[in-house]
Swiss-Prot record:
Subunit text: Homodimer.
Enzymatic class: transferase
Family indicated by similarity: Belongs to the purine/pyrimidine phosphoribosyltransferase family.
E.C. numbers: 2.4.2.7
Main location: cytoplasm
Protein name: Adenine phosphoribosyltransferase
Gene: apt
Pfam families, per the entry: Pribosyltran (PF00156)
Length: 189
């Protein structure tokens, strides 16, 4: 069942509109990428410019409310959201990539997956200590990637002002794993 987290502080008309848009533009793909998983596909959202604009606008509001000076997008779908948010704000954009995808010196963080580990990286000079960074991604599920991204940014002295996501899967422990980071989902499932 999909529902808006009515108790979320700071809900605005824009975030309520974004939740309504998301309900109509997220497709469930059964048993992908493995049996038993219901994948939340944002392709219908991306292929509908007006709907995508509403969602980006709500994410821009989240960034403004938190005084973000930099937007960090988590690979890969986080890039699709973070770039237009940074553009609308006139803010810096920091890509958080899978290991081995960035040229030059990097900082990395390794985190646990269900079966193994993964590593993400940022350029060593991507963020200055005085920057206020909003992390952006499509889904908060188990929280491993978001927690690692938060650690990377905090490790260079940036102030991470929150994690904005299209959807939070509330039946998974993502929020607990990224605590005390402020999580702002546009839609809670």
């Amino acid at each position: 069942m999909t529902s808006i987290d009515e108790a979320a502080p700071g809900r605005s008309a824009a975030s309520d509109a974004a939740a309504d848009v998301l309900r109509g533009h997220i497709r469930d793909i059964q048993d992908w990428p493995q049996p038993g998983v219901v994948f939340k596909d944002i392709t219908p959202l991306l292929s509908t410019p007006a709907a995508f604009g509403v969602v980006v606008g709500a994410l821009v509001d989240v960034a403004r409310e938190r005084g973000a000076t930099t937007i960090a997008g988590i690979e890969a779908r986080g890039f699709l959201l973070a770039a237009p948010v940074a553009d609308r704000l006139g803010a810096a954009l920091v890509p958080i990539r899978k290991q081995g995808k960035l040229p030059g010196p990097t900082r990395s963080a390794t985190y646990d997956l269900e079966y193994g580990t993964a590593t993400i990286e940022i350029h060593a000079d991507a963020v200055r200590p005085d920057e206020r960074v909003l992390l952006v991604d499509d889904v908060l599920a188990t929280g491993g990637t978001a927690a690692a991204a938060h650690g990377l940014l905090a490790g260079v002295g940036a102030e991470v002002v929150g994690l904005a996501v299209l959807m939070e899967l509330s039946f998974l422990p993502g929020r607990e794993r990224v605590a005390p980071l402020d999580v702002v989902p546009l839609l809670t499932i």
